[in-house]
Amino acid sequence: MNILFIFSRHSENPNDSTLTKDLSDEFFKQGNNVTVVTLLEKKYKRETELKKENGYEVLRVKTGNYFNIGNKFEKGMTILTMASDLKKEIIKYLGDRKFDLIITHTPFVSTEKLINPLKEYFKCPAYLILWDIFPQNAKDIGIINNGLLFSFFKYREKKMLSAYDRILCMSEGNINYLKENYSYLDKNKIKLLRNWAIIKPNTEINKQEIRNKYGFSEDEFIAIFGGNMGKPQKLENILFLAERSLENKKIKFLFIGNGSEKERLEKLVKENNLSNITFINQVPREDYEKITASCDVGLVSLDERFTVPNFPSKTTDYFKLSLPILASLDRCAAEDYGNFLQNKVRGGLFAEAGDIEGLYNQFMKLYNDESLRKTLGNNGRKYYEEYLGVDKAYETIMNEIGRWKWVFLQVKLY
């Protein structure tokens, strides 16, 4: 099959592993003709280019700047012009190709202003991987307070979702939320596609050497949060947990990554003398996994104000590395993700976000019981191996393509 992927990012390093890159690599590995379209921000001072990377063609389209910039006006202008930039260059460079399917993801590159013209031009269906439910998630945590602005984005959301032939959700909670709150959607279009990863064997690491490199001793108990430090995570709740744990000198907290809230969090740590917290900037993937594997607990955090189900993607990394998870979750996520984590996989524990004493009690269960940590970590690893391989994601999508073709054929016949 000829597959057109449209991704907001696509690493040029063939050894990098990300959700989107792993998926396109798998489609290519399975014998499909793969083309990836992705952004090439103007800050890199390069023009639009089409070249082979890792065996298949990648079209990098010059756009405005979006990632890791503080200028909201510039970011907004990039979003407004992105669809037309991408559409123009896709037609210019790929217009003579035949595609059987378009696959993209939220946010930003999924707008119907891009997808509808491409569907019509290439005469093929489009599948959406739904990673966030915007604008409701932004309203929940106070990013959008204006009623008119919220209504505008809800209108845009309806136009976007209606453009797709399949909407692929990360969890049963996402599926149920869409079915209950989006009456205009055909329920048969909404399907489950769990996050995925390349299945790799457990690798032995020198735990003491890695810990020493980053200033930790072998006998310390390290809880790690890796990933985006933004408003949705509300990492103040983890700071409160760290403050509650200050008396125990063996307990340490490690934050790895970047994000819009990182600077503010570092300031809070300094102001409150939270000497048990360490921040590390984003590191290469291989180093991140080694650091994470040398820790004792993986942390997940979500703002308690959320009313939409979220499924933290870092879960797959923790499962992969046999790391037990402690999650601070809003009520909506507790019913979906929390139940999945604690009762289905049995790969971790959770408490409701904002209940610091409840979170601390769950944390101390893990601290005091090495056997429990090992059991939870092994359960997560087992689930990862059985259900979260990128090959499973590939099979899910291919099965949906088969069903879509069958329905399309029936419509033509009758």
What are these regions (language model features)?
Residues 248-250, 254-257, 262-289:
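Nucleotide-activated donor-binding/catalytic signature segment of Leloir-type glycosyltransferases, i.e.
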Residues 162, 168-169, 174-197:
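Helix-loop-beta element that forms the nucleotide-linked donor phosphate-binding surface
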Residues 14, 233, 284-293, 298-319, ...:
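Nucleotide-sugar-dependent
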Residues 117-121, 148-169:
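Membrane-proximal helix-turn-helix segments that form the acceptor-binding/catalytic region
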Residues 1-57, 245, 409-414:
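N-terminal subdomain of nucleotide-sugar transferases
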Residues 358, 365, 372-386:
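A short, well-ordered alpha-helix in the C-terminal region of glycosyltransferases
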Residues 48-51, 202-216:
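A short helix/loop element that forms part of the nucleotide-sugar donor recognition site in Leloir-type
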Residues 217-233, 238-242, 254:
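Conserved donor-binding/catalytic core segment of Leloir-type glycosyltransferases
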